[in-house]
């Protein structure tokens, strides 16, 4: 093991959430490190390269209002804009943009790499290091630990094992660092896990399956077990990707062209007009 520089915050994962988390911390003056498997994959849009849609479009504007970057990134990488549900009332209308995903990722990487207080590291976090804090977990009037104060305790009718002996004794756990796949120990006061679909990931192609993150990228193995040891419960979600087809096998004459809107509403409140990528 080799010790790395210490940080206030370690953000694990360079997708949309990791970008916003690392930028927010760094802009508040916290010494931050963004740890990602590949610098080239920061902000990578995996499947349908779009931002916004029902509910999600509102969230993007809320992120922008809080100082986030997603709205500005999509405004600068947009290739088509549509306001969904224009025939219905304003309550269900939602902005959505298709992005040039190469440009989006490139812009996101540039912002990350040029932000003060923010460092990047190509590696994979596989373990979270904690110690018992000197701050006790909250107790109720009878002196028992309050419901919900321990990760993994009984809740909503389901029973899970307590986290660690320290939790059983009523002591909080506090983050002291993370461990990476390449044997680095990175001391930090807080860790933000934005791992997306990579934790213990598997890919299924027909009857074939194998450990994987995205196609051609490694999954993350070890971090799930680390969280389980701390008392967190984990589950598995599934995402499906439509098959890719060869362009020359498609008869585009049978398709109906769907134009974008001429009136474009920027996602960012800072933008008055849209600069499309060349």
What are these regions (language model features)?
Residues 4-15:
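Beta1/beta-strand and adjacent pyrophosphate-binding region of the FAD-binding site
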Residues 5, 23-127, 182, 194-214, ...:
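Conserved N-terminal/central alpha/beta ligand/cofactor-binding core
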Residues 8, 176, 189:
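Conserved acidic residues
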Residues 11, 21-22:
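Conserved phosphate-binding elements of NTP-dependent enzyme cores
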Residues 18:
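N-terminal Rossmann-fold NAD(P) dinucleotide-binding loop
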Residues 129-132, 171-184:
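Conserved beta-strand-loop-beta-strand element in the redox core of flavoprotein oxidoreductases
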Residues 133-172:
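Intrinsic disorder/low-complexity segments
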Residues 187-195:
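Short hydrophobic core segments
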């Amino acid at each position: 093991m080799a010790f790395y520089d210490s940080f206030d915050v370690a953000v694990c994962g360079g997708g949309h959430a990791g970008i916003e988390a690392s930028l927010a911390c760094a802009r508040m003056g916290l010494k931050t490190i963004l740890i990602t498997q590949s610098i080239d994959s920061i902000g990578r849009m995996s499947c349908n390269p779009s931002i916004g849609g029902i509910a999600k479009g509102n969230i993007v504007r809320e992120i922008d209002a809080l100082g986030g970057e997603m709205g500005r990134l999509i405004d600068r990488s947009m290739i088509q804009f549509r306001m969904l549900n224009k025939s219905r009332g304003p309550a269900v209308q939602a902005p959505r943009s298709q992005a040039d995903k190469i440009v989006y990722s490139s812009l996101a990487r540039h912002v990350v790499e040029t932000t003060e207080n923010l460092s990047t590291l190509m590696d994979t976090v596989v373990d979270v290091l904690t110690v018992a804090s000197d701050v006790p977990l909250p107790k109720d009037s009878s002196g028992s630990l309050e419901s919900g104060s321990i990760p993994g305790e009984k809740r909503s009718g389901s029973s899970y094992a307590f986290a660690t002996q320290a939790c059983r004794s009523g002591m909080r756990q506090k983050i002291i660092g993370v461990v990476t796949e390449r044997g680095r120990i990175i001391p930090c006061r807080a860790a933000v896990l934005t791992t997306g679909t990579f934790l213990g990931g598997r890919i299924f192609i027909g009857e074939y399956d194998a450990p994987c993150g995205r196609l051609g990228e490694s999954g993350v193995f070890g971090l799930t077990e680390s969280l389980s040891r701390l008392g967190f419960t984990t589950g598995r979600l599934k995402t499906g990707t439509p098959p890719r087809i060869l362009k020359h096998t498609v008869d585009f004459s049978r398709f109906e062209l769907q134009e974008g809107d001429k009136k474009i509403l920027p996602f960012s409140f800072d933008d008055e007009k849209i600069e499309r990528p060349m």
